[in-house]
Amino acid sequence: MASSDLPDWSEAHEIIDRVWVGNVFAATDNAWLKRVGITHIVCAAAEIVPLFPLEFAYLWVRIYDWEADEVMSWVDRVRAFVDRGLELGGSVLIHWYRLPRGRVVTSCP
């Protein structure tokens, strides 16, 4: 599915097969998440908590962009979580709170 299926204020892009990067609005659109086959969500934001814990597997990365050292401490856990989601045949959304920032791209496989 294309990111054009999302509301105008939402943004997500499939960066590699079955791995999406998006903002918090994409992560709150339950219908879109299900439509594109998301099964695992990496929430790279200290500001919010997982919204659908009974419907998707979550990895909550509670960090802020300005904590560069802390970002690197999560890379192995994020990669393992993404790999597991893909191994199980699912799709993964990695999302941030507001804008695409280094914390999301750093953690991508």
Predicted regions and their residues:
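Cysteine-based protein phosphatase catalytic domain of the PTP/DSP
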Residues: 2-94
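A phosphate-binding catalytic loop at a beta-strand-loop-alpha-helix junction
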Residues: 89-109
